[in-house]
């Protein structure tokens, strides 16, 4: 099942269109791709979540947040990651200055997730490498929580980490504590901010719905809201639009762009699609 005609793999020869829970007549790949009217009907670009509404939304701002004065958000020097006899990363140098926006491309298995795990303090081999985050060398006394509190993160795998069926508002609020699940209760101010971000992504009506009952697209929007609640200095988005329909892809992309236009916001964006 695909939500974007451009995602159809090259080896596919036939397509079964589905519209309004009804299977339409099957088509060859060529017939389907040439039927612009059908594609427009299956993948509408307008609707209640259309991106033009985003400009009218005021993104929440943490008025108590002190602007970060760091110069370099990330610097890696000759990084090497190895598991057994397999080398994942070798002699990698990478520097991201405060406020820069980076796109990270590469096929599955190229080492993107490993690279991100170093940045997000989830890889123990980071201590065996020369790595700086926010002008501070890893292993110089900071905890992983000191690092995570300045980073917003979402990835396709995050869906798999949530096994407890809790209200969606709890999932969004867990972003304040960098936990999988809500082990600490949000205060009133944090809950208000979480609800504001849910409203930005158009899912405030889902706040009391159990997370595991949501569609995959609704879950993705909730996890995106979770990534933004802290007003992070660094936002890491690993295929953030995966699983969204066309209109919500546009909406989410516009929100990301609007957030990253703020001074001092650094972005690492992982995607398979250059147009994103």
Question: Positions of the model-derived regions?
Answer:
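Conserved beta-strand-loop-alpha-helix hinge in the C-terminal portion
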Residues: 21-52
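Conserved structural motif at the start of ABC-family nucleotide-binding domains
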Residues: 74, 88-91
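ABC ATPase NBD Q-loop/coupling interface
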Residues: 130-146
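Hydrophobic anchor residue at the start of the ABC signature
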Residues: 224-225
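Catalytic Walker B motif of ABC-type/P-loop ATPase nucleotide-binding domains
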Residues: 235-239
């Amino acid at each position: 099942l695909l939500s974007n005609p451009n995602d159809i793999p090259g080896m596919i020869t036939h397509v079964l269109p589905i519209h309004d829970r009804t299977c339409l007549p099957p088509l060859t790949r060529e017939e389907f791709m040439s039927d612009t009217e059908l594609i427009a009907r299956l993948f509408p670009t307008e609707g209640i979540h259309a991106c033009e509404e985003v400009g009218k939304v005021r993104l929440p701002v943490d008025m108590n947040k002190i602007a970060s004065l760091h110069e370099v958000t990330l610097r890696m020097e000759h990084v090497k990651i190895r598991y057994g006899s397999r080398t994942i990363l070798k002699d990698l140098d990478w520097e991201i200055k405060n406020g820069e926006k980076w796109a990270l491309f590469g096929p599955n298995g190229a080492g993107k997730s490993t690279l991100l795990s170093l940045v997000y303090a989830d890889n123990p081999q980071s201590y065996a490498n020369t790595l700086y985050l926010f002008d501070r060398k890893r292993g110089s006394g900071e905890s992983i929580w000191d690092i995570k509190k300045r980073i917003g993160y979402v990835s396709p795998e995050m869906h798999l980490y949530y096994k407890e069926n809790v209200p969606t508002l709890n999932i969004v609020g867990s972003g304040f504590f960098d936990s999988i699940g809500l082990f600490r209760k949000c205060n009133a101010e944090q809950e208000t901010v979480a609800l504001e971000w849910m409203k930005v992504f158009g899912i405030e009506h889902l706040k009391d719905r159990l997370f595991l009952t949501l569609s995959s697209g609704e879950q993705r929007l909730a996890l995106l809201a979770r990534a933004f609640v802290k007003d992070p200095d660094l936002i890491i988005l690993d295929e953030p639009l995966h699983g969204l329909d066309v209109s919500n892809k546009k909406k989410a992309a516009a929100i990301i762009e609007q957030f990253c236009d703020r001074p001092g916001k650094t972005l690492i964006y992982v995607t398979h699609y250059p147009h994103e």
